[in-house]
């Protein structure tokens, strides 16, 4: 399992990114990201995002000469990213049905993309400080079969994911600029009155 961590800063936003390369499901990994440093300014909101790609295949073989009726297969892929009080999660189910002859290997493949973003501007205290926060990223696959007879069934499912934690804030630099502007106006008014 390969995991990557990245950090970027844009205007009034600090974003931490966690990447998990395609890995056999189920999996769950815990990484840590820094809390928001209040020396940068005042934290206004936090957003957690999860984007994932899941793919896999099933191999079904009928072992019963007396049956050639439709069989149904399904797989539900789910991903989530949890940090602090926020959890971003989503799931997608892929299903299909086919008639399978005795002794023939029936192969089905699937590929899905799924994601979710959640944010909050309340109770931000847990996200502020000089320590780190655990980010738990996970992916699961749940499979189902419905049909008659004896059979052999094998599933292979994998998922990759990118989780981000974004801090949006009012920077101290912006506050200083506003303060300077107000100060200049006061000076001009004082000067004009002399």
Name each model feature, range by range.
Residues 63-95, 163:
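Extended low-complexity, serine/threonine- and proline-enriched intrinsically disordered segments
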Residues 11-13, 17-30, 89, 95-113:
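Solvent-exposed, conformationally flexible loop/turn segments
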Residues 175-181, 185, 189:
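Asparagine/serine/threonine-enriched low-complexity, disordered tracts
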Residues 11-65, 157-160, 164-175, 192-194:
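N-terminal segment immediately downstream of the Sec signal-peptide cleavage site
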Residues 99-156:
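Cysteine-clustered segments with highest specificity for TGF-beta superfamily mature ligands
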Residues 81-87, 122-134, 169-171:
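A short, structured loop/turn motif at beta-sheet edges
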Residues 1-4:
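Bacterial N-terminal signal peptides
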Residues 6-9:
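N-terminal signal peptide c-region/cleavage motif recognized by signal peptidases
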